[in-house]
Amino acid sequence: MDRLTPEQRKKCMQSNKSKGTKPELALAKAMWALGLRYRKNSGSIFGKPDFSFKKYKVAVFVDGEFWHGKDWEQRKAEIKGNREFWIAKIERNIRRDMEVTGRLKVEGWAVLRFWSNDVVKNTTCCAEKVRQAVRDKQGLSKFQTREK
């Protein structure tokens, strides 16, 4: 049974951000410091990545552990209230994440997914991984341009 009234639960859920979270802001700042210039939450890219480098086809997602099902089999057992709803919701999110990643890869995108806690603990390392992915795609991009 939920300890909150439906109105309290609604307010609580509405306060959960889908963009502009602290981990996203930290990664944005670190990438900017490395000279990376990105687009945020671009609706023109399937899956609406948190950060994208459209020219090089690099998409970056910062996934919250609960919402995107980190260690799902273990965490699933820990859900107490409204189990059916939450299990269905998180499993739907996991399937959607796999679909988005798969489709972007088929379309030639490099897809990086970071857990939000990993970004918080290792912001610079995550930003470096993004920079390397962009560099890898820059090299590929130049090679493809020369062949045409």
UniProtKB/Swiss-Prot annotation:
<keyword id="KW-0227">DNA damage</keyword>
<keyword id="KW-0540">Nuclease</keyword>
<keyword id="KW-0255">Endonuclease</keyword>
<dbReference type="Pfam" id="PF03852">
    <property type="entry name" value="Vsr"/>
</dbReference>
<dbReference type="Pfam" id="PF04480">
    <property type="entry name" value="DUF559"/>
</dbReference>
<dbReference type="InterPro" id="IPR007569">
    <property type="entry name" value="DUF559"/>
</dbReference>
<protein>
    <recommendedName>
        <fullName>Type II nicking enzyme V.NmeDIP</fullName>
        <ecNumber>3.1.-.-</ecNumber>
    </recommendedName>
</protein>
<feature type="region of interest" description="Disordered">
    <location>
        <begin position="1"/>
        <end position="21"/>
    </location>
</feature>
<dbReference type="GO" id="GO:0004519">
    <property type="term" value="F:endonuclease activity"/>
</dbReference>
<keyword id="KW-0680">Restriction system</keyword>
<dbReference type="InterPro" id="IPR004603">
    <property type="entry name" value="DNA_mismatch_endonuc_vsr"/>
</dbReference>
<keyword id="KW-0378">Hydrolase</keyword>
<keyword id="KW-0234">DNA repair</keyword>
<feature type="compositionally biased region" description="Basic and acidic residues">
    <location>
        <begin position="1"/>
        <end position="10"/>
    </location>
</feature>
<dbReference type="GO" id="GO:0006298">
    <property type="term" value="P:mismatch repair"/>
</dbReference>
<comment type="function">
    <text>May nick NmeDI sequences that contain T/G mispairs resulting from m5C-deamination. If unrepaired, these mismatches can lead to C-to-T transition mutations. The very short patch (VSP) repair process counteracts the mutagenic process by repairing the mismatches in favor of the G-containing strand. This enzyme is an endonuclease that nicks double-stranded DNA within the sequence RTCGGB next to the thymidine residue that is mismatched to 2'-deoxyguanosine. The incision is mismatch-dependent and strand-specific.</text>
</comment>
<dbReference type="GO" id="GO:0009307">
    <property type="term" value="P:DNA restriction-modification system"/>
</dbReference>
<dbReference type="InterPro" id="IPR011335">
    <property type="entry name" value="Restrct_endonuc-II-like"/>
</dbReference>
<comment type="similarity">
    <text>Belongs to the Vsr family.</text>
</comment>
